[in-house]
């Protein structure tokens, strides 16, 4: 039996597979070694998964996750998972999982648009080129976190439409100070920012929201996709 996991910054999907058949699927909170220590990741995995997962006789655990592009970060995740499952672990980036799922053995440009964003050129076997995602502060164009950041920045400066601002305050029931605390002092500000995207999704017919979303996506293409050979290769997307 194998355990396969795919994780973004917000959610992790775990699948127990035996003889190419799905046995059980479970969702837990997202894991990211850029924002969590080894101990925090271990605790999240232990508390999030059913106890039965740790009693299974597993041949291998395959983990594809956000923030796992470097050897150092892969080691953090790998050590956390080995401590819990006591079985061989293979850790790769969520971008490789996306590329394999989107293209299988075909070459193309794979893109992730979720809480964060990422992209790569995949040659049908491996990732050949990757424009750095750079995170929600320095990059992540097109992502939910950046969309939320752009809206909140306008909201705090009085630039968001009044009706939309009122709707936001009525739905979220948070003050300006609460927003600042969530972004600068609380854990996982990227998750908080990403939730704002769901709110904005209900107002797609609003010209301000439409332009905000369009400009965010355009930025993703201009700063990421355009650095690949997008004229000669297909572009495909996954994400929330």
Residue ranges and their predicted role:
Residues 55-74:
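Short hydrophobic interaction/assembly module
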Residues 1-61, 80, 102-107, 152-240:
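ATP-binding/phosphotransfer module of carbohydrate and carboxylate kinases, centering on a glycine-rich
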């Amino acid at each position: 039996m194998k355990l396969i996991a795919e994780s973004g910054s917000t959610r992790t999907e775990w699948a127990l597979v035996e003889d190419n058949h799905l046995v059980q699927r479970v969702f837990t909170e997202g894991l990211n070694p850029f924002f969590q220590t080894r101990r925090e990741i271990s605790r999240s995995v232990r508390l999030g998964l059913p106890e039965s997962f740790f009693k299974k006789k597993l041949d291998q655990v395959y983990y594809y996750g956000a923030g796992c592009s470097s050897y150092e970060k892969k080691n953090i995740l790998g050590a956390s998972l080995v401590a819990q499952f006591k079985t061989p672990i293979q850790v790769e980036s969520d971008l490789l999982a996306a590329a394999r799922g989107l293209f299988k053995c075909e070459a193309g440009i794979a893109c992730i648009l979720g809480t964060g964003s990422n992209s790569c050129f995949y040659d049908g076997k491996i990732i050949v080129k990757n424009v750095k995602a750079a995170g929600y502060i320095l990059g992540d164009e097109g992502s939910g976190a950046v969309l939320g950041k752009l809206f909140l920045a306008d909201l705090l400066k009085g630039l968001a439409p009044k009706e939309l601002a009122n709707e936001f305050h009525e739905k979220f029931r948070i003050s300006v100070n609460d927003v600042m605390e969530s972004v600068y002092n609380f854990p996982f500000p990227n998750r908080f920012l990403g939730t704002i995207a769901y709110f904005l999704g209900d107002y797609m017919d609003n010209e301000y929201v439409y332009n905000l979303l369009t400009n965010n996506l355009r930025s993703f293409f201009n700063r990421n996709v355009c650095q690949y050979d997008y004229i000669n290769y297909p572009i495909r997307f996954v994400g929330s």
